[in-house]
Amino acid sequence: MNRFEKQLQTHKASLKREALLTLQLNIGRQCNQACRHCHVDAAPWRTETLAPDIANRIKDWIRTHRPQTVDITGGAPELCPEFRGLVQTASKAGCEVIDRCNLTILLEDNFEWLPEFFSQHDVTIIASLPCYQPKNVNHQRGGGVFDKSIRALQLLNQHGYGESHALHLVYNPVGPSLPPDQSELEADYKEALHCDFGIHFDRLFTITNQPIARFAEDLRRQDKWDEYLELLSNSFNPESLESLMCRSTLSVSHEGDLFDCDFNQMLELNIRNGKPLKLWDITPADLEGRPILTGEHCLACTAGSGSSCTGALA
């Protein structure tokens, strides 16, 4: 029994899937950045991407089942040739469409079309900006990324984002610590970005770093693995359990495989029925009531104020 399971047992809690609200599509590992905290291990040299035949099956499923939200992530999902078609299909089906954007992709050659495309389809942008100061951003995401991110945010503002279209930012701690209070940090971000750069955005989401992939490698290299897991376990908040995203989100890989969350996907903890299930094997109702696969990494979502792809939970 791992530390997360012990916490569930202590609090007499269990995790089961509820009605599906969000279909989260991870459509590849390729990215124009290679961030230190990235749980996907995304990078420019990664080649995994969504193939046209798989994309067509996913689009058929969206047309049939019309989930409330289609959340598209990666990598930099915009690098995938199937990205445009997925956005168009989900938008036409009446779904809220979310793009998890690293911002710098907007400044890459041949991607000048993105801001106008986003606004045309009223895509909600959730963009990573781990700090409102250059030092921390460049440390976590690479030299020059802060300045590019600011330019990209200003470009999005020019296309109505932060006003008529939703623009949210994401904060990750730089090191092995819990995020600060989300509402207080949001106020700091808004003041700094508006005063220094004239930037407007809607909400800030704080997300706890998952002890997997590159961040796990950093923890072990710094001999802080046990210390960080102990911090997460000691900060367990049972009030976060009811709002965990794995209850209502279905994560789908670029090959169509199913997972309870994107973090489980990176650990290959497939949803199975004797064998790994594909999206086109199921309906949303088929998943309701199924136990959620968990591991020690789940402590990151239940520590402190809780954590999810849309920020704090409790």
Predicted regions span which residues?
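Conserved alpha-helical substructure of the radical SAM core
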Residues: 1-74, 78-89, 93
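Conserved, mostly hydrophobic/aromatic
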Residues: 31, 149, 301
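Alpha-helical scaffolding segments of alpha/beta enzyme cores, especially the outer helices
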Residues: 57-60, 82-92, 113-116, 148-151, ...
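Radical SAM enzyme [4Fe-4S]-AdoMet core and its adjacent flexible, acidic
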Residues: 134-246
